[in-house]
């Protein structure tokens, strides 16, 4: 039996809803062996981020080397990278180990509004990571920051996706959670030549912490298994939809999604 492996390079979320915790849970649910290289330790829960403690670049380097030299991931996901030095190191390691299935989730702001990427690091991300990405998965605010565009419609998202491909991304997925229309959400994929849209009903819930991480992790898992970008996009969109529809309802603020829902359809939260 083939064992597919995925590496997440991201921050740790003590609340378990986002970051490497969400990534590893998602990998596991999709039958992919998950590995991690932690960029920062965050103290957070459903009420917000209470502290961000970046690790050193050397610590990050050692983690990536340890995984890459022995376990050889089939796909790599990047999440919270915090500063330009970390982004530069990740880019070096992508080149050193020849990672060619890199999913870039350009994490910038936490659900509660806390900054997870230094402002001066955005230019480095654009210069070094976008051209090395197999796919980049921004939400609308992140796509606006990366392109400098104002995005207020699906047509605007299409133009932004085309711009991100011109910046070097092979594939672009701009998620629609920040921009519901007619009580529906549309996620948009641009593969460099054609668009693919997945539309599903808008779910009115505050329990959406970690949806961006989870989407990108599902995309990474399916990519590690050899799916095409279109197949992986469909699985990722459905994975997140199930996770939000079958919310766990834990915590007093923006609660996490249900990473168990895709396989089990729903989790019996009474037990």
Curated annotation (Swiss-Prot):
E.C. designation(s): 2.7.1.49, 2.7.4.7
Catalytic activity: 4-amino-5-hydroxymethyl-2-methylpyrimidine + ATP = 4-amino-2-methyl-5-(phosphooxymethyl)pyrimidine + ADP + H(+); 4-amino-2-methyl-5-(phosphooxymethyl)pyrimidine + ATP = 4-amino-2-methyl-5-(diphosphooxymethyl)pyrimidine + ADP
Residue sites binding 4-amino-5-hydroxymethyl-2-methylpyrimidine per the record: 44
Any one GO molecular-function label of the UniProt entry: ATP binding
Gene3D superfamilies to which the protein is assigned, alphabetical: 3.40.1190.20
GO cellular component: cytosol
Keywords of this entry: ATP-binding, Kinase, Nucleotide-binding, Thiamine biosynthesis, Transferase
Pfam families: Phos_pyr_kin
Pathway(s) where this gene product acts: Cofactor biosynthesis; thiamine diphosphate biosynthesis; 4-amino-2-methyl-5-diphosphomethylpyrimidine from 5-amino-1-(5-phospho-D-ribosyl)imidazole: step 2/3; Cofactor biosynthesis; thiamine diphosphate biosynthesis; 4-amino-2-methyl-5-diphosphomethylpyrimidine from 5-amino-1-(5-phospho-D-ribosyl)imidazole: step 3/3
Family, similarity comment: Belongs to the ThiD family.
Function: Catalyzes the phosphorylation of hydroxymethylpyrimidine phosphate (HMP-P) to HMP-PP, and of HMP to HMP-P. Shows no activity with pyridoxal, pyridoxamine or pyridoxine.
Protein name, as recorded: Hydroxymethylpyrimidine/phosphomethylpyrimidine kinase
Organism of this sequence: Bacillus subtilis (strain 168)
Gene designation: thiD
């Amino acid at each position: 039996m083939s064992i597919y492996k995925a590496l997440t390079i991201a921050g740790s979320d003590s609340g378990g809803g986002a970051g490497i915790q969400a990534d590893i849970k998602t990998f596991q649910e999709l039958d992919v062996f998950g590995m991690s290289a932690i960029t920062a330790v965050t103290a957070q829960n459903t009420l917000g981020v209470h502290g961000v403690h970046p690790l050193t670049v050397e610590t990050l380097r050692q983690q990536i080397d340890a995984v890459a030299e022995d376990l050889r991931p089939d796909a790599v996901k990047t999440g919270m990278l915090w500063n330009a030095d970390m982004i530069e190191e990740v880019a070096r390691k992508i080149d050193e180990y020849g990672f060619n299935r890199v999913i870039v989730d350009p994490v910038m702001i936490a659900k509660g509004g806390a900054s997870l990427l230094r402002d001066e690091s955005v230019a480095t991300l654009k210069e070094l990571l976008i051209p090395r990405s197999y796919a980049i998965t921004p939400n609308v605010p992140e796509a606006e920051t990366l392109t400098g565009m104002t995005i207020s419609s699906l047509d605007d998202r299409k133009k932004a996706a085309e711009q991100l491909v011109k910046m070097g991304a092979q594939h672009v997925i701009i998620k629609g959670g920040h921009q519901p229309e007619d009580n529906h959400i549309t996620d948009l994929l641009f593969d460099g030549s054609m668009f693919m849209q997945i539309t599903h009903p808008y779910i009115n819930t505050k329990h959406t912490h970690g949806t961006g991480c989870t989407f990108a992790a599902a995309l990474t898992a399916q990519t590690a298994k050899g799916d095409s970008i279109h197949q992986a996009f469909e699985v990722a969109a459905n994975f997140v939809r199930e996770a939000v529809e079958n919310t766990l309802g834990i915590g007093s603020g923006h609660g996490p999604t249900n990473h168990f829902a895709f396989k089990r359809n729903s989790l019996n939260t009474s037990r």
